[in-house]
Amino acid sequence: MTLSLTNVLETPPTDGWPDEALPLRVELPPAEPFPMDALPAVMADYGHVIQRCSQAPDALVGNSLLGAASLAVQPYVNVQLPHGAIVPTSLYVISVAESGERKSAVDRLALHPHAMFEKSKSGEQREAIEERKRLPKAEMEKTEVPREAVFLASDPTVEGLCKLLYNGLPSIGVFSAEGGRFLGGYGMSDDASLRTAAGLSLFWDGAPVDRVRAGDGASKLYGRRVALHLMAQPRAALQWLQNPILKDQGLFSRCLIAYPQSTAGTRLFRPERADETPAAANYVARMAELLAGPWPIDEFHELKPRTLRIVDEARELWIDQHNQIEQAIAGELREVRGLASKAAEYLARIAAVLTLMNDPAATLVTVDAMKSATILMEFYLGEALRLSNVQPKHEQADLAMMLWTWLAQRGKRYVTLPEMAQFGPAKLRKAQTLRMLMNVLSEHYLVRPVPDGMVEYNGKKRREAWEVRL
């Protein structure tokens, strides 16, 4: 076997690389602790209990409680920003966690009162259906069909959401401990992702949403609310967050994302049950009080939430935070300017949710709630910055790392496709795979192609060859 540089070119085109080599994977810096004590005591106390009993990551617990609170509060109140705009109190939360991080257990505990509410509504629906069936046919045909009772939806399309909100409850939650099903499902396929993102963005904004029905035209949905909390594994979540179409559309700027440190390997057995503690009883009672209603619904089945105002000290704090964030958009928050541009609105939304969790009859956002919202928003902006340049871990990166390790250990300046196909890692010896991976390595300035015929292998000039950065 011979590997030599021909003298076709007097000066090889390989002097000087265009840039510093880029890592195949960017390692995440450690996550900051979730500020659990920024939540109202009725939530924070239960959050600490869930964390202690389930030993799940802290932000997984915090996000679950915050999402659950938003779902309970959103039918009742909007919040008026100091400049006059009135916005919903819906929150969109995304938790990133590996398999086995107790996502389902945490979700079940946070949403237990919501599941009981949904079960109660389902029972009412069944009773109404049976009563309707007992009516004389002529009278039954004049009676409205009982509405659907779905309150918690796991992976619907926007079309499915519109149908649920039209035929059922005017406020629902998209909550899933297996959010990868939603992120990778039909609603987020290449053809449907933009439509799904646009629809979810409109729901977050509180704007009317078009509902197109085959056969009977179109209508608009007014007065509907959607809260969202998706838990997903890193590969699915980070690939979704790297989608350039969705980045440009603006959905991500409406999402509060956390990727906490794993607790795997530290979870020794503990016999305590979170749902049998006084903190659980207090949390369930407060959520049940909020969910019980009655919801402010008009004759058109549209929500008519009252408006919480931000005044006095809370207003001054909001304005101060607004100005600080706005100035930072040109500096340290430049990489997350989408979320940063909505951070002041999110401050108001979170503060309103926390206010109602403390006092369901409140009419003004409290300064304590605004202080807590500031702490929480700082956490989410920090998480967004931490995740802003992270590449999703996927098989292509793993395989590229495998090939790069072989090239580095081989220690030769030039390599050809036939040599890699013959002697490279056994898993990577198909020409198509090798070309794809060498492109990845080239994009990271670890290799670069050389002109046809410049390198010989086994006595033949090769068309496909690369220089290796050693």
For the regions a language model picked out, list residue spans one by one.
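Phosphate-handling catalytic cores of nucleic-acid transaction enzymes
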Residues: 2-470
